[in-house]
Amino acid sequence: MGKYFGTDGFRGEAGITLTADHAYKVGRFLGWYYNALRERNGDTDPARIVIGKDTRRSSYMFEYSLVAGLTASGADAYLLHVTTTPSVAYIARVDDFDCGIMISASHNPYYDNGIKLIDCYGEKMPEETLLLVEDYIDGKLHVFNKDWPELPFAHREHIGCTVDYVAGRNRYMGYLISLGIYSFKGVKVGLDCANGSSWNIAKSVFDALGADTYVINNKPNGLNINNNAGSTHIEGLQKFVVEKGLDVGFAYDGDADRCLCVDEKGNVITGDHILYIYGCYMKERGKLLTNTVVTTVMSNFGLYKAFDEQGIGYAKTAVGDKYVYEYMAKNGCRIGGEQSGHIIFSKYASTGDGILTSLKMMEVMLAKKKPMSELAAPLKIYPQVLENVRVTDKKAAQNDPAVQEAVSKVAEALGDTGRILVRESGTEPVVRVMVEAPDHDTCQKYVDEVVNVICEKGYKV
């Protein structure tokens, strides 16, 4: 991770740690850089960069700032307006854009925002390009064998254009609809749009496929995105599904790159359930290439036990859909994701896509003629206790011999009945201690043992 860009973009509180000036500079660099790459390849046409945003009040400010920077550098800016992160990735890839930009802080509260950069393949922008952006922001850019204390401005007819590109968002919606291989007619579906990016897309897609669609949290006002809504506050959808007697519910986050489900009984279907359900579905049809589902180290122990019973292999990556996709692309895997609901179907998308995930879950229900509760039933989620310990030095705490010995003792005691995971937070001075076991008391006992050692060694703040 760099100074500004983490695993999921440049994120911070709008106007404090992420400002309009930052956005302008990101636009200035990207517009200039992609024009320069074109010129080096003998292409005199201006760079084309597509931009989407979520519903936060500050997203409009950042959109205008990015457009100012891009056009000042001579690039053309194409505006999808309010849309989802996966739609930007899709359009960047299929419409031959130099890159894509999504303005969103995903599941964070309204006062945060972020800038996610996407390359021309619809994938997260390479680290080396992000480092160049950061160097320009800090006034120390060196690229093309030269220092660039300032970038040239475009002038006259070379100033970039701004293009209303809502047609791109509509094209993405058409693509999603085309993936629906069964009619949804007669199925009562609940959608929680988190007052975010999916509010003007998800219902239209489900309606087009014939569902009886009921929606909550689809009235964004700039301040209510993720506010007791969406996949991080799924209790609202649970209640809605039960009260309305719906067949299934789907909850998205602020930029709709993740999805969690609610079955007809009001139970939460996590990302681990989704991986299990679709992994089994693909294996039954002989389409689970490499016989592997890609997970992260945070997936539940019960998922791996269930995969073992089904004869399905699995891989574990670091936390972050970026790492999941990297493994999938390198090893030819078709499905992977996170417990949080970032699910990647590599045949159809290059990033997690919440609406696509919900369509795929509908496909399994309709193909197997089973309710969601029955599809999820074989997966037994193990009780989990997770404690975040704020420490003075997270690396020293995790690598301390006494801490490692305590972790080893717990792992030995659990054997094949559970697991312990101790890892550093990527963004905070925190060590996370997590235990999964057959019962909650066992989890708590072993978490306490490790946390006590961290405290005894003087690391806890």
Can you describe what each PLM-predicted range is?
Residues M1-A68, A72-S73, T162-G186, K395-N399:
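An N-terminal, well-structured beta->alpha segment
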Residues E13, N113-V242:
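Gly/Ser/Thr-enriched, mixed-charge loops and adjacent short helices
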Residues R40, R48-D112, S204-V262:
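N-terminal small/polar loop signature for handling phosphorylated ligands or for N-terminal nucleophile
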Residues G42-D54, K188-G190, N291-V297, R432-M434:
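Short glycine-rich phosphate-binding loop at a beta-alpha junction
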Residues L80, L131-M173, S178, E264-G337, ...:
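Proline/glycine-rich low-complexity loops and linkers
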Residues P126, V215, N267-G286, G354-V364, ...:
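Gly/Ser/Thr-rich active-site loops/lids in small-molecule metabolic enzymes
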Residues V248, R285-V461:
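Phosphate-binding and adjacent anionic-ligand microenvironments
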